[in-house]
A protein has these predicted regions:
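Karyopherin-beta/Importin-beta family HEAT-repeat alpha-solenoid scaffold
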Residues: 1-769
Length: 769
């Protein structure tokens, strides 16, 4: 165990460039050795170094997992097969989701075969590895294997060995979570099994089996949805209530599993769950309101004392502070569960909204446990959403007061100022970022009701940014010292990443205020923009700072240009934005080319003088030698999107639009940046519906390019968001346009356009139609 931990830490400290050559020189020979212990060691080592070597291994994920795939089912020794399966699971976690995308066809059959292993441990671990795999896998890649996988898991459930059954239940839950509605066909077979386990698993030795059955039932319910689960819901809820009424011993983890199951069932049943709140809420509020179990003693009194497993000890001077972590973990879990109920039920949660607010707000500075603070921070936007939903429906609070605008404003006033105050005192950079994220969300929900808190928010932003910039300067100073080494560099990089997240969330806060209040908020933001953001556009600042400054001004242009309010920033922003389009950093390029498109769309004639330079710069980005490389492709697709906006909104300023617009069309479809792809393909449809004079050409000679886009995008409309290239609404319009073209375009033109796509694309398009 110590050796494994050391290997993990060495890989993280030294990274792929140092560790992978050593591994490549050592592991293959060990894998071919006749001694099973050496083969076992090689596979364990491979799993341990993965986290630290992600960048290197991601270059060839199939090659990285190949040694494990070979040994998982073929090695004669069960402990080697176990190590191989363990390696597959670990690599799926560390190299996901790329490994699932690239190697699903190799990994899934191996795991399915390993589930039939003669060793219960290997079987059980194969099911556990399936959990790792499914968590990062798009449902489309799992679907072809679902029948075989479900058959295996059901066989394992019936097998009788408790360890195998427990792992099978966890895997079944994970598969249901991944498959979602596609799991419906297995529901009638699976649920009776699960209910049988829930009823029959009695005694201490079966506690975990029963707990995992709860977990599985709730995830299956969430996957198939309320309509299919509803006939069984009452029976399941009654079983859970009976178990809860019976109480749990202190060492019984069932209570924790039950709380999480209640939460999932709430998500499944929606408002039908409200009737069960009276059962669920009392113990949950009790857990959320637990006081920390803290003891302060003299350090010298306990030199010989044995430390308890769930007690954390901190030495402060000559004192010894003991904190019972199990209490804090229970409190944190309960707070997270409360967030879920508020989020799901919204106005339906109104009877409990006040006690939850009164529980959560004081926890913003609960310094005993970070997860408790994080949960409190995360709950506040959901609390406001619940209050807003109650206001819109004019619900009646338990006090008898109708929830109106005054009630909601009061709720905003109860939640937002303590969050701003907590931000200024928060010692952890990661939680500062979470607080800024929460503030951004609160501002978006509160809308005009945030106005009276803007001055305090901006003061909080200034204080946070000042502290962050000071810490950056201190880190840069440290990096310049003579004895600064690689290990310190690794730590500094991690600190910098956390600091960058603070700046990211600050930008999100400003964006949220601009989206909520538009141009009228600009005067209040002016000092912040002038003193902190504009200087970050300078070429001497770090790429991350430049990117964030560009993102902020992108938002200014996008959301505060009504009445020309943003034009005062145009001259100061256009230059850095165009320069950023060819920056060495891909993220700076992406933010910059996006900004060019925003200005083209929002600023009208005022942007006209910048159109020639913008066209030239975007062409540089799009035509760069490695424009479609993995690191650059998102910036490239955003550049194509911005070129489209210039074509649509700045047409009069384009020299030779009859050639530029078809050139833009020929760059489509977009396939990598799914958000931008959906936006651009919707724009294309909009331009076609408006009979754009330059898009198709005088004799519809560019119709083939349109058909190519439709053939790629249309079949994806029904897929998950990660794979969807056009919305369902856009797909409907594409179909209507194709039908319209069949009646209005000459047959020979249609034939020529149809021949521009492959037979496979033709078939996919016909099926989509």
């Amino acid at each position: 165990d110590v050796g494994q931990e050391c290997l993990d830490r060495v890989a993280i400290a030294l990274g792929a460039n140092t560790v992978l050559p050593c591994a490549a020189a050592t592991i293959p020979a060990l894998l071919g050795d006749g001694d099973w212990r050496k083969r076992h060691a090689a596979l364990v080592a491979l799993a341990q170094i993965a986290e630290g070597c992600v960048k290197g291994m991601n270059k060839d994920v199939a090659g990285a997992v190949a040694p494990c795939l070979g040994a998982a089912t073929n090695d004669p020794h069960p402990r080697v097969r176990w190590a191989a399966v363990n390696g597959i699971g670990q690599l799926c976690t560390d190299l996901g989701p790329k490994i699932q995308e690239k190697a699903h066809a190799q990994i899934l059959p191996v795991l399915l075969k390993a589930m039939e292993d003669s060793s219960h441990r290997v079987q059980s671990h194969a099911a556990a590895a399936m959990v790792n795999f499914s968590e990062g896998c798009p449902p489309e890649h799992m679907q072809p294997y679902l029948d075989a996988l479900m058959n295996k898991l059901l066989q394992m459930l019936q097998g009788g060995h408790r360890m195998v059954q427990e792992s099978a239940l966890t895997a079944l839950a994970s598969v249901a979570d991944n498959a979602q509605t596609a799991f419906a066909k297995y529901y009638s077979t699976v649920l009776p099994f699960l209910k049988q386990i829930l009823v029959g698993a009695a005694g201490k030795e079966h506690r975990m089996l029963r707990a995992k059955a709860m977990e599985c039932i709730s995830l299956v319910g969430m996957a198939v949805g309320k309509e299919q689960f509803a006939p069984d819901a009452r029976e399941v809820m009654d079983l859970l209530m009976q178990l809860q009424a019976g109480g749990f011993e202190d060492d019984d983890t069932t209570a924790s599993y039950m709380q999480q199951a209640w939460t999932r069932l709430c998500k499944c049943l929606g408002r039908d769950f409200i009737q069960y709140l009276q059962v669920v809420m009392p113990p949950l509020l009790k857990s959320a309101q637990l006081k920390p179990d803290v003891q302060v003693t003299d350090a010298e009194d306990h030199e010989e004392a044995e430390e308890e497993e769930d007690v954390e000890v901190i030495a402060v001077g000559d004192k010894r502070i003991s904190i019972r972590t199990s209490v804090l973990e229970e409190k944190a879990t309960a707070c997270n569960m409360l967030c879920c109920y508020v989020d799901e039920l919204k106005d339906g949660f109104l009877p409990y909204l006040q006690p939850v607010v009164e529980t959560m707000v004081p926890l913003l500075d609960f310094y005993f446990h970070e997860d408790v603070r994080k949960a409190a921070v995360a709950s506040l936007p959901d609390i406001l959403r619940a209050g807003k939903a109650a206001m819109l429906k004019q619900c009646v609070a338990p006090t008898g007061q109708t929830v109106d605008a005054a009630y909601f404003r009061q709720l905003v006033g109860y939640v937002v100022p303590p969050l701003i105050k907590a931000l200024s005192k928060e010692p952890e950079v990661e939680i500062q970022a979470a607080m800024l994220e929460s503030l951004a969300d609160c501002a978006g929900v509160a809308g005009e009701h945030i106005s009276e808190h803007i001055a305090a928010m901006i003061e909080g932003f200034q204080s946070t940014l000042k502290g962050s910039l000071e810490r950056r300067a201190e880190r840069n100073k440290r990096a310049g010292t003579e004895d600064f080494d690689a290990e310190e560099m690794e730590a500094l990089t991690d600190e910098q990443a956390a600091e960058d997240e603070v700046f990211d969330q600050f930008a999100e806060c400003v964006g949220s205020l601009l989206r909520s209040l538009h141009a009228p908020v600009l005067p209040a933001l002016e000092p912040l923009l002038a003193q902190f953001v504009a200087p970050m556009l300078g070429p001497d600042r770090s790429p991350e700072e430049r990117r964030i400054a560009i993102c902020v001004f992108d938002d200014v242009m996008e959301h505060a240009s009504d009445g020309g309010a943003s034009l005062r920033y145009l001259d100061g922003f256009a230059g850095p934005c165009l320069a950023g389009c060819t920056d060495a950093d891909a993220d700076v390029r992406q933010a910059s080319v996006y900004g060019v498109g925003v200005m083209a769309e929002k600023l009208g004639q005022a942007f006209a003088p910048h159109v020639p330079a913008s066209l030239q710069t975007l062409a540089q980005v799009i035509q760069a030698p490695d424009a479609r490389g993995e690191e650059n492709v998102n910036a490239t697709e955003n550049a194509i999107s911005s070129l489209g906006k210039i074509c649509e909104f700045q047409r009069a300023c384009i020299p030779g639009p009859e050639s530029v617009v078809p050139q833009w069309l020929s760059m489509l479809p977009l396939t990598e940046d799914k958000v931008e792809a959906r936006a651009v393909h919707t724009q294309l449809v909009r331009m076609l519906e408006a009979n754009d004079p330059h898009l198709l050409g005088p004799n519809s000679e560019h119709l083939g390019s349109v058909v190519k886009v439709f053939a790629t995008a249309l079949p994806t409309a029904g897929l998950s968001e990660k794979l969807q290239l056009c919305t369902v609404e856009c797909a409907g319009k594409m179909k209507a346009l194709l039908m319209q073209m069949q009646g209005s375009v000459p047959p020979e033109t249609l034939t020529r356009a149809w021949s521009a796509i492959t037979p496979e694309q033709q078939q996919a398009l016909q099926q989509a139609m």
